[in-house]
Amino acid sequence: MVGEGMLDAAVPGAVFASPTAGQILAATQAASGGAGVVHVVKNYTGDVLNFEIAAEFATDDGIIVSQILVDDDLATTSMTGDGPGRRGTAATVVVEKIVGAAAAAGADLERVSALGRRVAATSRSMAVALAAGAHPGAARPSFELPSDEVEFGVGIHGERGVGRRTFASADDLADQLIRPLVADLAIGRGDRVIAITNGLGATTGLELAVIHRRVTKILAAAGITVERALVGPYVTSLDMAGCSVTLTRADDELLTLWDAPVRTIALSW
């Protein structure tokens, strides 16, 4: 996701762990050109904490930092108490593309941040796994899943989901993924979306295409137009077998930014 029209820097932590505040600060300093730096942060406790610490240090160095929190995972909407709430998943790709295009076009820090927050607020995702992934070096998968069941609401760090259901056809699984997203976003006839059918690591392109075909049919039947789409392994959980679907409300402004030139390994047009 790093390149022309998208990110200036990315900060990977250890596998399934957040980057350290020191790593984030180093990336922030490297990306700073004097106009401020936008942090795009997936909503996980460690990530949020370390990015906030790094932002404080960056501010001390004279760098203006703005944060966009991505929290699109519908499966964790109902979490209460001291938990972080909805997790950040594949909608991060949409946020990064939009804010990257806006920054490349010369938008200031305030405008870029506002666009990113709008995209995050109007994006929802849901994932399903047919088999758990495994941490490198682990002797067994992160959770056990019988062959006649699927796990809904899995995360991108090997986390188990929020519920199990009977194994079903690709069309049935797509139905179960897409309908809660449509309901939560309150979209219907005449609305427009950007859709991502995302592989979790061990799902083939053909399987993802089958899911995406059904997603587009469901949306078309509801009068919802898929203006732009991505199909592929963009935000994975290493070797987990499964997929997620992301919907983002679209309008002319966002589509113009989406269509703006981008040159990264993941996206290029």
List the predicted regions and their residue ranges.
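Short, acidic/small-residue loops that bind anionic groups at enzyme active sites
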Residues: 5-15, 59-88, 221-226
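Glycine-rich oxoanion-binding loops at beta->alpha junctions
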Residues: 3-34, 182
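Mixed-charge interfacial surface used for oligomerization/domain docking
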Residues: 105-210
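Short alpha-helices
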Residues: 70-111, 115-122
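C-terminal non-catalytic interaction/assembly regions of soluble proteins
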Residues: 180-269
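Extended, charge-rich low-complexity interaction segments
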Residues: 43-48, 95-109, 250-269
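Short glycine-rich or small-residue beta-strand-to-loop segments that form or flank ligand, phosphate
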Residues: 7-10, 36-45, 52-55, 66-70, ...
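Short Gly/Thr/Asp-enriched flexible loops that form oxyanion-binding sites at enzyme active sites
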Residues: 48-62, 207-213
